[in-house]
């Protein structure tokens, strides 16, 4: 390979390679580093990097209650059930819905995992991003979504934002809002969009939430948007309740035939969440969180090559990206303290520096 490096490239600039120097494939790699001037800054992140089979961070999450709505009807309520249906494994949050074998869970066919950040981490506006995958099967009904911290107006008046849903065996993602205007009055439609994917693969699902617009992306490609109307008739009927704090919910549920089909009691449903992150612009909205002052720049990150991998050391929470020499990102996450990353032999790039792993 011949390499042509462009440093400090600015938006709109181009780079040309002479045709007579190209013989075969051309590989283009881009690396973007935070410099403090980026539009969106990381405000909150959970990388789910706790010990295997530990529970999600209690400073941010708690288990959802079991209630009558379809998605909540099987939610685990015992410590044993919660341990089996929402736990950390291999740097992922594992949410499951499985056959109920625990007498203390009561007379329910299945038990399901569902966690939420209400009263602990809630925010107004920003970019919410999650990397996730699910296991398509008849009755599958997982979700990554937002509900209002103040729900005194009740559902759907107070609003709901479904960042991502998938049902049954469909290779499709759904992105939806629910309000009094859309659900009860059937106005201000369409309120939902979808895009085709391979549901069994990991995808990065993103929601951009501004005072006037909701925009969904799947793997960086715009999938759907929903705007605040300027019609007083619709605003008076609750078309836009999205100007106050919402919290996160991550869950693996199953259908009852109303949308997703009836569940397969003998199947183990599973959805994995690799990470959840919140970015905001300076001065944009508020965030209340048990995790404060996450820094993305100006904090030291030391990197050491060791046998079989890299040691990353950061006194303060610092976002780290590790790339192979070909430009493939092999790690992206927060580092605080000491973190060893197992890697195969080769050359890697961290914070703009090449490091050899032997």
Language-model segment annotations:
Residues 8, 83-88, 301-305, 333:
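Short, exposed beta-strand/loop patches in secreted or surface proteins that constitute
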Residues 35-287:
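GH16 jelly-roll
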Residues 1-16:
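Surface-exposed interfaces of beta-sheet-rich extracellular modules
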Residues 14-24, 339-344:
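Solvent-exposed segments in extracellular or luminal domains encompassing
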Residues 23-25, 125, 200-202, 345-347:
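Extracellular Ig-like/FN3 beta-sandwich strand-entry sites
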Residues 1-3, 216-218, 322-327:
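Conserved aromatic beta-strand anchor motif in extracellular beta-sandwich/beta-rich domains
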Residues 292-358:
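C-terminal outer-membrane/trafficking sorting elements
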Residues 10, 27-42, 280-299:
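Low-complexity, Pro/Thr/Ser/Gly/Ala-rich linker/spacer regions in secreted
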